[in-house]
């Protein structure tokens, strides 16, 4: 059994949706006495310094993201670009390889392990330096296990046709597709790590281990402790006007932006429910504010019970407020886990293939929420939005009762302190054993 204090390097994909879960894991590992060297762009370091809870053990090391001609000047992460340019950002990430190798070769003490996700070349340089590599994935095991088969069904059989616009062959770097990159990243390291637990995704984890012939190490959800930062007083005051569990909180993430017609249907669907709601969503591309695209007369009609906010909101704090009773989410992996540990009814609106698979897990396997049904072109009418929300918010609804019962069961398990600590302790032991092999 391993007992070694580890030195682990973290190099996640250049996105805050990856930096932050990697930092949450780093805090959990440092809490147990392990040393972390975390590689990330300069501006991201400045933004995340305050979330480093163990600065004596976690060192955030800034790296330079090389300029790519097709990207805006100074782009360092997905926060600086639209979704359509993520493939070009991966070119920039690949061009960090010489700097990453140089840093790894000079670190003292020498690292035992390096965690990565999208930089599929990491195992090559790690092996050369005598460092074990772990493909640590914040996406769910169901996505890792099934996404290849999902993409293979090019005729659209058994998959929603709206997902087919996300092309498996689209470039994600120079002369490499996103699918090729993912398969190399999973097939070449010493182990595969996943932010998940066996109770929820055991069958998919076993399938991944068999498919890639690699040990699969599970860290648990590694969600942070509840934040000491209070919810913005403005929103506390607004939410305080409504009954417990009555407010719909809709937050669809920053990766995919609805177009104007779809955003209007969503807004009208929220209005049709008759319930108070908080819509946090970015304006469509080409528009500076939500006011430019909301339906005519909408703001006036809902002024006493609805907020449409185009900026950032504190999602965990919003979900923890007692007035919030429904979470309409996009099923990104982090939001999925935050949803599962919340005490809200769940409505699921995935927007890209891995989110769609997460929604399958949530709605079909765990039965903790309902999916919003799309047309073949991906569209959703206001009536469908309203119907999905009402199905989980109507106190007389059998669906509402079922998803609440199932959600409570899984939530109670996931927030159990012994359960959480057991996973991180087992994960560390597995890493120690891997290093000592």
Curated annotation (Swiss-Prot):
Pathway: Secondary metabolite biosynthesis; terpenoid biosynthesis. Mainly expressed in flowers, flower buds and young leaves, and, to a lesser extent, in old leaves, stems and roots. The active site is at residues 18, 117. Component of the oleanane-type triterpene saponins (e.g. saponarioside A and saponarioside B) biosynthetic pathway, leading to the production of natural products with detergent properties used as traditional sources of soap. Its EC number is 2.4.1.-. Pfam families: UDPGT. It comes from Saponaria officinalis. Transmembrane segments: none annotated. GO terms for molecular function: UDP-glucosyltransferase activity; UDP-glycosyltransferase activity. The gene is UGT79L3. It is an enzyme of class 2 (transferase). InterPro entries: UDP-glycosyltransf_plant (IPR050481), UDP_glucos_trans (IPR002213), UDP_glycos_trans_CS (IPR035595). The lineage of its organism: Eukaryota, Viridiplantae, Streptophyta, Embryophyta, Tracheophyta. PROSITE patterns: UDPGT (PS00375). This is UDP-glucosyl transferase 79L3. Belongs to the UDP-glycosyltransferase family. Keywords: Glycosyltransferase, Transferase. Soapwort saponins possess anticancer properties and are also being explored as enhancers for endosomal escape in targeted tumor therapies. They may also serve as precursors for vaccine adjuvants. It comes from the Eukaryota. CDD domains: GT1_Gtf-like. UDP binds at residues 254, 312-313, 330, 335, 338. GO terms for biological process: glycosylation; saponin biosynthetic process; triterpenoid biosynthetic process.
